[in-house]
C-alpha cells in the first residue's frame, strides 16, 4: 500500500516535479496549504525555492510554522528540500536577516563571491549561485544543486552528507531523529535523487 505523504504548498516554488518524483518512488501524494491538514500528517515533505523574506517569515510566525513544528515534535518523518531544509535552522542572513523554524541549530549564510575555481594564479572565480551537479561525501554520488546560501550547522553531528563548492564545505543533507533535510533537489537528481526519496518514504530517513 502506498505511503501517504503530505506535500506542503507554501508558495515557495513549483511542486509538480517534487510530486512526480514522490509518486515515482511509490508515495501517495496529497498537496495542501492547509495548516490543519499538515498538523495531522504522518509524513511531510516541505520543499522550497527562492529566498528568505516576507513569505518565509509569514510561514515561520504563522499557523503553517506551528503545524510544521507540531509534526517534528510528534516524531513523524519530515523532509525539508532546498529552502525547506534551510528553514529548519535558526536564522538566515538573507535580505537583512530572517528567522527560521529553529528546529535545528545553525545559520544560513551566502557563498562568498571571491572563490577561485582552482589553485592556479588567475583561475576564474566561481559563480554564485552554485548551480549544477556536484558530488556529496561520503556517498560519492552526484546531485543537482541550485542555491546562493548554505547552512552553517550549530552541531556537526546533524550533518549526514557534505558537499564542497570552492573553499566552502556545506551540508548536503542533515538528519536528527525524525527530521531530515537536503540542500540538493532530489526531484532533479535523476536516479540518485529518486533513491534518496525512496529511502525516506520507506524508512522515514534519507
Tell what function each PLM region has.
Residues 1-76, 83, 107-114, 192-206:
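N-terminal beta1-alpha1 cap of cysteine-dependent amidohydrolase-like domains
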Residues 3, 140-141, 175-180:
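Beta-strand-turn-beta hairpins that frame and shape the catalytic cleft
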Residues 9, 143-145, 180-184:
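Active-site-proximal beta-strand elements of phosphoester/diester hydrolases
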Residues 12, 85, 150, 188:
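Short, glycine/acidic-enriched loop or turn micro-motifs at the edges of active sites
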Residues 82, 147, 185:
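Histidine-centered divalent metal-coordination motifs
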Residues 82, 86-88:
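Glycine-rich nucleophile elbow surrounding the catalytic serine of serine-hydrolase chemistry
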Residues 91-167:
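Pocket-forming structural segment of enzyme catalytic cores
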Residues 151-206:
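C-terminal and late-domain segments of enzyme folds
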Amino acid at each position: 500500500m502506498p505511503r501517504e505523504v503530505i506535500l506542503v504548498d507554501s508558495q515557495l516554488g513549483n511542486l509538480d516535479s517534487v510530486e512526480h518524483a514522490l509518486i515515482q518512488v511509490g508515495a501517495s501524494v496529497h498537496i495542501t496549504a492547509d495548516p490543519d491538514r499538515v498538523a495531522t500528517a504522518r509524513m511531510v515533505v516541505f520543499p522550497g525555492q527562492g529566498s528568505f523574506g516576507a513569505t518565509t517569515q509569514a510561514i515561520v510566525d504563522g499557523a503553517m510554522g506551528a503545524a510544521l513544528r507540531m509534526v517534528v515534535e510528534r516524531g513523524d518523518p519530515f523532509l525539508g528540500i532546498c529552502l525547506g531544509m534551510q528553514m529548519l535552522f535558526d536564522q538566515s542572513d538573507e535580505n537583512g536577516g530572517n528567522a527560521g523554524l529553529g528546529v535545528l541549530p545553525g545559520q544560513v549564510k551566502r557563498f562568498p563571491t571571491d572563490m577561485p575555481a582552482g589553485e592556479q594564479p588567475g583561475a576564474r572565480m566561481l559563480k554564485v549561485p552554485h548551480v549544477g551537479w556536484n558530488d556529496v561525501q561520503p556517498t560519492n554520488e552526484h546531485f543537482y544543486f541550485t542555491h546562493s546560501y548554505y547552512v552553517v550547522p550549530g552541531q556537526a553531528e546533524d550533518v549526514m552528507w557534505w558537499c564542497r563548492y570552492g573553499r566552502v564545505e556545506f551540508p548536503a543533507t542533515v538528519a536528527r531523529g525524525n527530521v531530515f533535510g537536503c540542500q540538493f533537489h532530489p526531484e532533479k537528481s535523476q536516479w540518485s535523487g529518486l533513491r534518496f526519496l525512496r529511502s525516506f518514504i520507506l524508512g522515514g530517513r534519507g
